Swiss-Prot record:
Belongs to the RecR family. Residues 80-175 form the Toprim domain. May play a role in DNA repair. It seems to be involved in an RecBC-independent recombinational process of DNA repair. It may act with RecF and RecO. This is Recombination protein RecR. NCBIfam families: recR. The lineage of its organism: Bacteria, Bacillati, Bacillota, Clostridia, Moorellales. GO terms for biological process: DNA recombination; DNA repair. It comes from the Bacteria. One of its GO terms (molecular function) is zinc ion binding. SMART domains: TOPRIM (SM00493). A zinc finger (C4-type) spans 57-72. Gene3D superfamilies: 3.30.60.80, 3.40.1360.10, 6.10.250.240, RecR Domain 1. InterPro entries: DNA_Rcmb_RecR, Rcmb_RecR, Rcmb_RecR_Znf, TOPRIM_dom, TOPRIM_RecR. Coiled coil: none annotated.
Length: 199
């Protein structure tokens, strides 16, 4: 079907977003054309501002608008415990449980040989650097319950145990192949309560 070039560009751009197929991209594009121009400008401005002002925390790798992030600079949090997650969005899911008061470390991915992602492409060196002063007593591995997440957890477990730090893994009542961001608060709270050392 023929669309004017600007509309085609918008549909194509929206279709590049995760979880947005061609039909949804089309619906979103048509919706954006119907809303008042001020709403479209507000959306465009919000996207640009988020891209310009959101950075990675130099300590944990979480998204932030200041460095270090609010979690890393909070004196009320337990600085002797680090919870390792794959993506920054996983922190939001875990924080909703209100069960964990330690710090985080975002790997920005998981080991996936099929995709050419090894430990070198993840923020493993930065994690090791955080452990060298001896203040961290426990590292909780909260990677996803899929093949890549399990591979990453096993790799980190083996690596971190040589440093003498306690390494635990979240107990999962989550389906294998599931992502943390989609889990409900009760399931995540139980997972924190039942975490265990890998054997």
């Amino acid at each position: 079907m023929y669309y004017p070039e600007p509309l085609n560009k918008l549909i194509t751009a929206l279709g590049r977003l995760p979880g947005i197929g061609p039909k949804t991209a089309q619906r979103l594009a048509f919706h954006l054309l119907k809303v008042p121009a001020s709403e479209a400008r507000d959306l465009a401005a919000a996207i640009l501002e988020a891209r310009q002002k959101t950075i990675y925390c130099s300590i944990c790798g979480n998204f932030t608008d200041r460095d270090p992030c609010r979690l890393c600079s909070d004196p009320e949090r337990d600085h002797s415990c680090i919870c390792v997650v794959e993506e920054a969005r996983d922190i939001i899911a875990l924080e909703k449980t209100r069960q964990y008061r330690g710090l985080y470390h975002v790997l920005q991915g998981a080991i996936s040989p099929v995709d050419g992602i090894g430990p070198e492409q993840l923020r493993v060196k930065e994690l090791l650097a955080r452990l060298h002063d001896g203040k961290v007593k426990e590292v909780i591995l909260a990677t996803n319950a899929d093949v890549e997440g399990e591979s990453t957890a096993l790799y980190l477990d083996k690596l971190l145990k040589t440093l003498g730090v306690k390494v635990t893994r979240l107990a999962y009542g989550l389906p294998v192949g599931g992502d943390l961001e989609y889990a409900d608060e009760v399931t995540l709270a139980r997972a924190f309560a039942g975490r265990h050392e890998l054997e």
